[in-house]
Amino acid sequence: MSRAYVGLGANLGDARETLLAAIDELARLPDTVVRARSSFYATAPVDADGPDYVNAVVALDTSLDPAALLAMCLSIETAHGRQRPYRHAPRTLDLDLLLVDDAVIDTATLTLPHPRMHQRAFVLAPLVEIAPDAVIPGRGRARDCLETLSAQRCVRVLWNAPESPKENPR
């Protein structure tokens, strides 16, 4: 079994419900168990206009190889209506394969670790929450990368009821 981390994000529709559904779908993948789920975080879109994103990270133990796991993540995105009209477009669901153990892969369809994860608080804050000692191959400790991104707004969101978010600065 490998330990994989998947970043989740959405900013169209009911983002919270979409992320919860996607986590359930990840848990149903063959030979895969969800071991941890971060809190949800609200973040502004990167290089684009649109509603704030809701982001999270899950830790998976899986026997799937990274390419197969990525293909299944893309299939889950498609099932949730994901379209790619242009870079940084608003999305119903975005699933990013961030890390698989300490694998370093660079192919036409898969790059591990995720090539921009070390630059994104919305990835690192939830990752560090569930894996405080996570290391990004070639970049160092995730928490050290996060410390360099204090200017990026990334707010942990606590829901007491499905429709009533409360913010908790992180």
What is each residue range found by the language model?
Residues L8-A10, T62, V128:
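Short, structured patches in soluble enzyme cores that scaffold and shape functional sites
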